[in-house]
């Protein structure tokens, strides 16, 4: 199996089929968990499965991005009280090693109403169509994070973001550079500052 196939099969075993036996075959025994609410190791995950089944949790996978041994899922968790809310939207990052899911990071947030431009946290394109541009796109996004978010060189923002069509999925921000600028100004007025210190590859 490819890393993508392996991760999707593991997610199905844990969240769709609630099958600890199948999940055990897909998780490394020394599975590393970065979610602070879940102990590390495969055993805690396997022990959690019956409770997930009883909770009625339903997981919808919207997007899958895979490169090398890393796989990212964009998901919605419904009936997710076990994770702290009725419905959560999440990004899950998995690392695969020796044919097993070996490591996991995630970021979960409650679902919200559409943003001022009518976009939700999960709508939009789901298929990657320009695979021939993967290296260029990765370099562009990495440069954006380094230049704008980390170093704060906001005068160069139009080097990275379209002035004609910039779609925003943040629940509180409207489309376009004007929407982004207004949101950042509002954050500044409230003393909220985004600080990026490291880019992890």
What are these model-predicted stretches?
Residues 1-201:
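C-terminal and inter-domain tail/linker signature
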């Amino acid at each position: 199996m490819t890393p993508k196939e392996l991760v999707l099969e593991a997610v199905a075993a844990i969240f769709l089929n609630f099958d600890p036996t199948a999940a055990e075959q897909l998780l490394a025994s020394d599975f590393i968990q970065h979610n602070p609410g879940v102990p590390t190791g495969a055993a805690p995950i396997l022990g959690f499965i019956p409770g997930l089944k009883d909770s009625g949790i339903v997981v919808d996978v919207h997007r899958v991005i895979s490169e090398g041994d890393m796989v990212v899922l964009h998901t919605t968790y419904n009936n997710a009280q076990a994770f702290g809310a009725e419905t959560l939207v999440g990004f899950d990052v998995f690392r695969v090693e020796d044919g097993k899911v070996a490591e996991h990071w995630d970021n979960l947030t409650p679902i919200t109403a559409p943003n001022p431009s009518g976009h939700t946290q999960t709508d939009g394109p789901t298929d990657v169509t320009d695979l021939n541009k993967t290296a260029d796109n990765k370099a562009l996004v990495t440069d954006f994070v380094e230049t704008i978010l980390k170093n704060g060189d906001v005068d160069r923002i139009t080097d990275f973001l379209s002035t004609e069509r910039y779609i925003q999925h943040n629940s509180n921000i409207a489309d376009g550079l004007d929407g982004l600028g207004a949101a950042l100004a509002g954050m500044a007025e409230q003393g909220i500052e985004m600080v990026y210190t490291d880019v992890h590859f």
